[in-house]
């Protein structure tokens, strides 16, 4: 067998490397590696040479069959060396936007692969000559049944559902390819960064596997230095957005399953040793309980982690406006931390103060804009910078303002957040998954507090270890990406999940993990009201022992009579702040009628009037995030002429037109 043939079968190469010493003659024949080997003693000699490390062979007598075995062994060893070079997934790098990057956004060629012909053979086994090879015919008779360069293009970042009408409902595999010129810089390494790919992504560079990632809303990156070459290169991504019971989110959810590379793609240039992540916050108090940043401490805490456990590396922190220029040295684990005296102006919705920050290590300088604030609870109050605050919020899906498609830019974020500002909001719930980094940063600049959430939504596979690992990975990635955003005050771990011991064990582990990663923010989740007797609601949920803020969704007026709202009483047996994380009802913009006629603007308007009056009677109410800012696409909403695959609970239509209920909520917030 030639080296060229073995190159086409990496699984076989790996088998050879691992099993050569244990293979029998029958094994060689069965695997089709070498045929007609005569004289088992000659084979044993080859194996003995490996044990004795006597390669090249030193014994004199060589037969034709032994020489064949030598050639095979040479091939194995050579391919072993080749296969060790490649790409590796590396931990998420904090603040991509503040580093040296090259954008790969723009037009990507795509091929729709309904039966995954480009990945599996006809026996459903992965094979080594899939679409990721980007193969071209070398002779007139060569059979290659795909061609990226002749395929159509779509924009990245972007979803395929709204860029190709044939793919509006499509859930499956699409291959995307981008060619680009690259010239390596001496002494630097290159990471390939994706802001998000929904949902299952296999990534290839120049025909070789860079890595695999699962999860549709958080960033990931690979070190692809050894896969890139000087000159023309290409990246191919196999994207699959099919839904599965063990996924997070699971098979059913009430939003559009936008497939594709939905956020930025960048090449990131780094030094061999670089700052992987860092955190800046106000100094922690030393009171009882979990440490929280303290307004009166007069200190700033800085910590940083290198990509390698390298001691003695110098990291410099500079905040010019605060006259900070301080060096700190890493320990044996590659981390460094320091507490500095400083009294920055505190970030708030009224004064969203941000400071320019520079972090230098070696030849690399990272820039950021960071604010400082405190967030804590006291009894049933939420305190921002030591003062009680009422969170005047709204829930938002990550969907463009102009009719649909996944939002993916600062401009998209600014439009949606401006609508929330016009409503009188100081708070947004980014539902039901981590939104793109542009949205969080734009909210910070605009003075908008943020609730950020992972998609543990409805019916998760609570007892599946892989499902938990997936959820924890998404939680970790969300926190690592946004841990320096002053406006993020709540990490949410779930939405509307059914009560069970298995669910409690799953979610309490997530809450614990969130606190381990970041004890400077509040933990919550959107619960359901499950204990109701006539007009008395009692919020009973074991998870309330694990959260800092009790949050629940209720739809009085939509899933029960709107007139019941005035009769409702609420019992929340916890000395914790309360957020009503969802309420509302649907209306189609421009449809008018009596206030008891469902789907009219008047029905929604009256529902908001009755609900806001009811909310005023809830003891300990610290905020609310009604459902939802704008109408959004959902395959579950099929009522022709009304829903047309839109959830109509928005205060704006999908085109940005205000419904009557907008003014009810705006006026109510003006009193808070």
For every predicted segment, state its role.
Residues 29-31, 38-41:
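Glycine-biased, low-complexity coil/linker segments
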Residues 94-121, 131-133, 154, 197, ...:
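Substrate-binding clefts and catalytic carboxylate motifs of secreted carbohydrate-active enzymes
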Residues 229-232, 303-378:
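Extended acidic/polar, glycine-enriched regions
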């Amino acid at each position: 067998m030639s080296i060229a043939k073995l190159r086409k079968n990496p699984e076989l190469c790996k088998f050879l490397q691992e099993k050569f010493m244990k293979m029998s003659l029958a094994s060689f024949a069965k695997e089709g590696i070498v045929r007609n080997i005569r004289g088992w003693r000659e084979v044993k000699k080859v194996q003995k040479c490996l044990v004795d490390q006597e390669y090249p062979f030193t014994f004199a007598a060589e037969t034709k069959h032994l020489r064949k075995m030598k050639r095979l062994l040479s091939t194995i060893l050579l391919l072993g060396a080749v296969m060790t070079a490649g790409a590796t997934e590396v931990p998420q790098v904090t603040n991509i936007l503040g580093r040296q990057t090259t954008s790969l956004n723009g037009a990507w060629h795509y091929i729709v692969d309904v039966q995954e012909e480009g990945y599996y053979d006809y026996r459903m086994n992965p094979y080594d000559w899939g679409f990721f090879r980007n193969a071209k015919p070398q002779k007139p008779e060569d059979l290659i049944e795909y061609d990226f360069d002749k395929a159509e293009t779509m924009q990245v970042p972007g979803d395929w559902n709204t860029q190709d009408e044939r793919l509006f409902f499509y859930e499956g595999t699409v291959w995307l390819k981008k060619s680009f010129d690259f010239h390596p810089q001496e002494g630097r390494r290159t990471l390939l960064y994706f802001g998000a790919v929904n949902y299952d992504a296999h990534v290839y560079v120049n025909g070789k596997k860079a890595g695999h990632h699962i999860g549709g809303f958080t960033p990931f990156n690979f070190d692809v230095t050894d896969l890139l070459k000087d000159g023309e290169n290409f990246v191919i991504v196999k994207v699959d957005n099919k839904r599965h019971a063990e996924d997070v989110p699971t098979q059913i959810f009430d939003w559009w399953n936008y497939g594709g590379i939905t956020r930025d793609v960048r090449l990131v240039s780094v030094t061999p040793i670089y700052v992987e992540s860092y955190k800046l916050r106000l100094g922690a108090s030393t009171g009882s309980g979990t440490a929280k940043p303290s307004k009166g401490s007069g200190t700033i805490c800085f910590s940083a982690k290198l990509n390698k456990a390298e001691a003695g590396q110098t990291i410099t922190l500079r905040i010019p406006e605060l006259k900070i220029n301080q060096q700190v040295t890493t320990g044996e684990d590659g981390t460094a931390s320091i507490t500095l005296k400083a009294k920055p102006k505190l970030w708030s919705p009224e004064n969203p103060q941000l400071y320019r920050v520079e972090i230098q290590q070696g030849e690399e300088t990272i820039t950021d804009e960071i604010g400082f604030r405190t967030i804590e609870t006291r009894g049933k109050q939420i305190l921002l910078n030591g003062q009680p605050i009422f969170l005047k919020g709204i829930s938002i899906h990550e969907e463009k303002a102009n009719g649909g498609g996944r939002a993916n830019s600062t401009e998209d974020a600014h439009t949606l957040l401006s609508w929330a500002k016009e409503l009188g909001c100081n708070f947004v719930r980014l539902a039901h998954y981590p939104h793109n980094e542009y949205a969080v940063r734009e909210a910070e600049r605009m003075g908008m507090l943020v609730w950020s959430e992972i998609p543990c939504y409805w019916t998760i596979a609570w007892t599946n270890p892989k499902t938990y690992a997936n959820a924890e990975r998404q939680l970790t990635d969300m926190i690592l990406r946004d841990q320096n955003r002053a406006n993020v005050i709540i990490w949410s771990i779930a939405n509307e999940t059914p009560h069970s011991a298995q669910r409690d064990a799953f979610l309490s582990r997530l809450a614990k993990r969130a606190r381990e990663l970041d004890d400077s923010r509040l933990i919550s989740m959107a619960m359901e009201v499950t204990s109701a007797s006539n007009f008395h609601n009692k919020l009973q949920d074991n998870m309330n022992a694990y959260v800092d803020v009790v949050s629940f969704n209720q739809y009085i007026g939509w899933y029960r009579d709107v007139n019941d709202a005035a009769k409702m009483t609420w019992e929340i047996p916890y000395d914790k702040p309360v957020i009503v994380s969802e309420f509302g009802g649907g209306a189609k913009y421009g449809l008018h009628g009596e206030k008891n006629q469902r789907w009219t603007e008047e029905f929604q308007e009256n529902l908001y009037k009755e609900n806001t009056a009811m909310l005023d009677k809830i003891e300990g109410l610290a905020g609310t995030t009604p459902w939802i800012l704008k109408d959004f696409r959902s395959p579950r909403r099929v009522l022709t002429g009304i829903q047309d695959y839109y959830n109509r609970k928005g205060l704006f239509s999908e085109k940005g037109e205000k419904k009557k209920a907008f003014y009810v909520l705006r006026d109510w917030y003006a009193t808070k």
